[in-house]
């Protein structure tokens, strides 16, 4: 690991202090030209003792705006210190987790996976239009039927047609023939450019799309394509649970990756990560943002620098070995759960190396689902309920659930 090192609490505090010191201060400097300030002082007083030894809260109250994309262009000098923290974070995630070459990627910290996925579709839509001369009718998003709803949302907002490939109900995988048929149908309808979204752990099942099958079908189709990985859920889990996976930038076909830090990384909500190979952010360059130093390339515009700092702090506190240990503890709990479900003859789906277990709705009474707040695939007509083993889910919680589940099964 070149960039990712474990740090002590003191080292983290000192690094954030340095970053905030490099930012301009709304408390101490005559900044009169910007539509931003520190957080409201009547509610969030600067001298509150709660801020002592609390670097995230200190950053939050200073309220840095990380507008723009700091890997592409110059940025507002007002927040240069915390922008460096964001770049350090992106180096950790891009290079040390997703195996990008240093300096060969761009990215930023968006509001979450939905925005990051939308950013990818927006970039590739503009790429196909400007680089290939394709019309909107000649561009299509392709994904599995298990893909997150942010992709249909991106299709709607960006006016790019979408084609969902069915999955096998047992394996949750798209078949080679299903992919080939989808590409043939699209080609016959005049589509020339494919934005393919592959899943690194789907939201409902934790299933992982097989990239080799997808890329083989894409190459055989002779269609132009860009491959985006939606790792919003799995990005901070799957690379550590399955270190031999090929969903990273060492795979020449992978062009961009979405990760959500407010899921498995347990960062504050409104925190994702978007990564893409160098040379593509420019397709969404908003030159009209001429009053912003470096202008803008992102969907969201203004965004909190405190969120980037929070993720950097979390990863730094654990370090790579601590993160692997955390992942394997959760995976071990899921292994135990699945053995118990097998013994009880409960029908479920679990992707190998996943911490999501989806139970057949026929095995789950509504009162059990309510008690444990397990989530259905459809609140109107559920076929599956999912269990997600997060850090707070102990084996004792699972034992209690299994006891109630077994009573329901016997009934």
Give, region by region, the residue ranges found by the protein language model.
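N-terminal entrance/gating region of PLP-dependent enzymes' catalytic architecture
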Residues: 1-104, 384-385
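Catalytic cores of large soluble enzymes that bind and process phosphate-bearing ligands
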Residues: 4, 8, 49, 74-85, ...
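Glycine- and acidic
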Residues: 69-77, 102-108, 161-167, 192-200, ...
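Buried hydrophobic packing segments
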Residues: 86-93, 116-125, 151, 311-315
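A residue-level signal for conserved active-site and pocket-lining positions in enzyme catalytic cores
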Residues: 89, 120, 155, 196, ...
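Conserved PLP-enzyme active-site core in the AAT-like
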Residues: 108-285
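Conserved C-terminal alpha-helix-loop-beta "cap" of PLP-dependent enzymes
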Residues: 137, 286-301, 321-411
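Active-site C-terminal subdomain of aminotransferase-like
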Residues: 240-243, 247-351
């Amino acid at each position: 690991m070149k960039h990712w090192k474990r740090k002590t609490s003191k080292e983290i505090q000192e690094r954030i202090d340095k970053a905030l010191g490099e930012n301009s201060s709304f408390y101490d400097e005559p900044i009169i030209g910007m539509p931003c300030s520190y957080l409201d002082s009547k509610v969030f007083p600067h001298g509150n003792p709660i801020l002592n030894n609390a670097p995230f809260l200190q950053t939050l109250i200073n309220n840095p705006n990380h507008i723009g994309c700091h890997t592409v262009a110059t940025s507002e000098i007002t927040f240069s210190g915390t922008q460096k923290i964001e770049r350090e974070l992106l180096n950790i995630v891009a290079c040390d987790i997703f195996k990008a070459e240093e300096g060969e990627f761009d990215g930023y910290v968006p509001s979450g996976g939905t925005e990051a996925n939308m950013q990818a579709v927006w970039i590739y839509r503009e790429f196909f239009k400007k680089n290939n001369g394709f019309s909107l009718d000649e561009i299509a998003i392709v994904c599995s039927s298990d893909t997150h709803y942010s992709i249909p949302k991106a299709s709607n907002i960006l006016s790019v047609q979408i084609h969902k490939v069915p999955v096998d109900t047992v394996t949750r995988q798209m078949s080679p023939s299903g992919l080939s048929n989808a590409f043939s149908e699209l080609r016959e309808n005049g589509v020339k450019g494919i934005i393919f979204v592959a899943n690194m752990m789907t939201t409902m099942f934790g299933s992982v799309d097989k990239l080799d099958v997808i890329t083989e079908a894409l190459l055989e189709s002779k269609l132009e394509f860009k491959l985006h990985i939606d790792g919003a859920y799995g990005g901070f889990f799957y690379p550590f649970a399955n270190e031999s996976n090929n969903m990273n930038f060492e795979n020449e076909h992978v062009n961009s990756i979405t990760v959500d830090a407010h899921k498995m990384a347990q960062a504050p909500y409104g925190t994702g990560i978007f990564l893409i190979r160098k040379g593509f952010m420019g397709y969404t360059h908003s030159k009209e943002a001429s009053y912003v130093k470096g202008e803008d390339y992102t969907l969201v515009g203004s965004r909190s620098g405190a969120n980037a700092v929070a993720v950097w702090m979390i990863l730094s506190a654990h370090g790579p070995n601590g993160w692997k240990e955390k992942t394997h503890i959760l995976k071990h709990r899921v292994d135990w759960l699945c053995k118990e479900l097998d013994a009880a003859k409960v029908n479920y789906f679990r992707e190998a190396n996943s911490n999501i277990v989806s139970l057949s709705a026929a095995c789950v009474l509504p009162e059990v689902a309510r008690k444990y707040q397990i989530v259905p695939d459809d609140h109107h007509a559920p076929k599956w309920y999912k269990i997600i083993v997060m850090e707070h889910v102990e084996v004792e919680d699972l034992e209690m659930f299994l006891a109630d589940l077994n009573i329901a099964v016997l009934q």
